Amino acid sequence: MLAGCYPRPGDLLTRVLATGTFDILHPGHVYFLTQARALGDELFVIIARDSNVTHKPKPIVPEEQRLEMVNALGTVDKALLGSEKDMFEPLKEIRPDIIVLGYDQHFDIELLEEELTKRGLPAKVVRVPLSKECPLCSTGAIIKAVLKRYG
């Protein structure tokens, strides 16, 4: 069912979509994806392309490797690389019912829902609050710890 163009006609499953860079996979990512999965029956994940990451330092882990890691998680039905040109392009194929944002993804939910509706993609957008706390629950914290130890 997850091959090709991700069929939707007549299906009663709730399809959830999460997006992110997922550089240096950590428990915060796992928490986010587990919370996203709990909102529906299928979880698709779009991995940010290396070339599109402009709001923070470029990923350390190459996009193909990040894709492989996320696809290996049991909570994820299908992970795929995003479009380098149009962030809405893969959504046209996936046609999610719910789009889940992380606490650190700086999208305005109302504006995003408006843009989705304009494109014939009336998905509900929700944000997962930060709830997983651990010393190394962010890529930045992991990098700082490595530099401190081996710097």
From Swiss-Prot:
ATP binds at T21, F22, H26, P27, G28, H29, D104. Its EC number is 2.7.7.2. Keywords: ATP-binding, FAD, Flavoprotein, FMN, Nucleotide-binding, Nucleotidyltransferase, Transferase. This is FAD synthase. Coiled coil: none annotated. Its cofactor is a divalent metal cation. One of its GO terms (biological process) is FAD biosynthetic process. GO terms for molecular function: ATP binding; FMN adenylyltransferase activity. The keyword Disulfide bond does not apply. It is an enzyme of class 2 (transferase). Pathway: Cofactor biosynthesis; FAD biosynthesis; FAD from FMN: step 1/1. Homodimer. Catalyzes the transfer of the AMP portion of ATP to flavin mononucleotide (FMN) to produce flavin adenine dinucleotide (FAD) coenzyme. It catalyses: FMN + ATP + H(+) = FAD + diphosphate. InterPro entries: Archaeal_FAD_synthase (IPR050385), Cyt_trans-like (IPR004821), FAD_synth_RibL (IPR024902), Rossmann-like_a/b/a_fold (IPR014729). The keyword Cell wall biogenesis/degradation does not apply.
